Structures are given as C-alpha cells and as structure tokens.
A protein has these predicted regions:
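Short, flexible helix-to-coil linker/hinge segments that flank and couple to helix-turn-helix
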Residues: 104-109, 114, 119-170, 174, ...
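Recognition helix of helix-turn-helix DNA-binding domains
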Residues: 182-217
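Basic, Lys/Arg-enriched C-terminal extension of HTH/homeodomain DNA-binding domains
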Residues: 207-242
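Receiver (REC) domain active-site loop signature in two-component systems and cognate sites
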Residues: 68
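Short hydrophobic/Thr-rich beta-strand motif most characteristic of the beta2 strand and flanking loop
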Residues: 37-45, 53, 212
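Acidic, metal-coordinating helix/loop segments flanking the phosphotransfer/catalytic sites
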Residues: 45-61
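Active-site residues of response regulator receiver
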Residues: 19, 65, 96
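Acidic catalytic/metal-coordinating carboxylates
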Residues: 46-49, 71-78
Length: 242
C-alpha cells in the first residue's frame, strides 16, 4: 500500500471492535493498543451492542464483523450511518472471513468505508485503520477484483433506473469510471495524463455532486450509473483508494 496517512501530530485514533468471538476481540485489541496513536475505546459481541457503544464512546473507526448474533455487522453499519452522515460519524471497516460479493456490495451500500479479510497481515490492518480514519476508502485487493468483475459483467435489470449523473462533467465521468474500476488517484492521473492534484479536485467535486460520504460510495455510484457496463475491470495492485 502506498498511501501515506497523516492524522495530525499527536492525534489519537479511537477504535471500537465488534466481533462475536472473544479471542478475536482480544487479539485485535492487543494489536491496536501496542501501536502509538491508536486506542481501543470499546468492544462489542454483536451488532446491537456495537451501535449502543458507539453512542457513548465516539470512535473514529469501527472494526465490524459481518456474521454476529442479534444484529449482523451490515445492519449495524446501516443503523450507525443512517442517523449521522456528517464528518462526526464513525468510519466502518468490515472485517470478515467471507469474501463473497454480496457481502461486499451490501456493506458498501450500507455505508462502510472499507472491507478486509481477517487473514490480512497485521501491518496491513493497522494501515487500513489509519486510511479509514483519514477519510479514504479501502478494499482488500482480492475483494476489489471480484467486486469489479462481478458488477462489470452483471446485466442491467430492466426495471432498475440508472443512477443520475446530472451535473457531472465528461471528465468527472471518466474519473468516476476509473474509481469504480479500482484505480487510485495516482493511477487515474497516469491513465488520464493529469496531475494528481487535478484528480483530487475532480474526486472532491464528485463527492459533492453525488452526495457521497466517501470514496467507497463513489464506487457504488459508478456501478449504479451504468458507467462500467461497457468497460472491463482495470488491473490495479492497490486496495487503498487514495
């Protein structure tokens, strides 16, 4: 991963862990609290408890398992973010052993900012927390490839209207399509022969015009608008959408 994330001097990233396995919660807590600049503010055994704890502990990032009793991680994510779409809402990083496409797409639509498998190396998990806390989006590379391949090839339902891109310029459409294909800002800049700062400007305008909370939601917009129907998946080695 090549994304440098700076949370500011002395900034502490507050993390809440939601997983139904006590050993997993303990392992994640030990890993996170061994790193300067991060602290675990709570641990939940199910989605309902995660929603309750978030209200009182104000985490920056929630590590959310998918399959949990009482309330699964996707529903918990939906409830957390449905009531608070501004910058104060926590960023949700889905962690699971399941890399099935329906989980990825549903999690992103629920508002998750990232999706990683539980066998991700510890250093990559810590990087992911920093990336998510900084407002970027992240998908495990293997998940990104499957998501792109699945939805680029999926036939468009006749009854489902495409998402409107009214007000989006031709150049912004190009950028949005490349975001949907898994490219980082640096890769988009190379692809379109633009300065990376220019790409960042286009991304910022897309976020505003499409009322997207973060880059993960731009990926969903690219699929729902039909931009990828005539394009194959791009080859990207990066899971971080920087």
């Amino acid at each position: 991963m090549d994304t440098a994330v700076n949370m500011g001097s002395g900034a502490m990233i507050r993390v809440l862990i939601a997983d139904d396995q006590a050993l997993v919660r303990g392992a994640f807590k030990a890993l996170i609290e061994a790193v300067p600049g991060m602290t675990v503010v709570g641990a939940a055994a199910d989605g309902a408890e995660a929603v309750e704890l978030c209200a009182g502990h104000d985490p920056d990032v929630v590590l959310m398992d998918v399959r949990m009793p009482r309330m699964d991680g996707i529903e918990a994510t939906r409830r957390l973010l449905a009531r608070d779409h501004d910058a104060t809402a926590p960023r949700v990083l889905i962690l699971t052993t399941f890399d099935l496409d329906e989980y990825v797409f549903t999690a992103l639509r629920a508002g998750a900012s990232g999706f990683l498998l539980k066998d991700t190396p510890p250093d990559d998990l810590l990087t992911a927390i920093r990336v998510i806390a900084a407002g970027e989006a992240l998908l495990a590379p293997s998940v990104t490839r499957r998501l792109i391949a699945e939805f680029a090839a999926r036939p468009e339902p006749a009854s489902s209207p495409r998402r409107s891109l009214a007000g989006v310029t031709d150049r912004e459409r190009e950028v949005l399509a490349l975001i949907g294909r898994g490219l980082s800002n640096g890769e988009i800049a190379l692809h379109l022969h633009l300065a990376q700062a220019t790409v960042k400007t286009h991304v910022g305008r897309l976020l505003a015009k499409l009322y997207a909370r973060d880059r993960a939601q731009l990926v969903i917009a690219a699929y729902e608008s039909g931009l990828l129907n005539d394009q194959g998946p791009a080859s990207s080695s990066l899971g971080v959408f920087a």
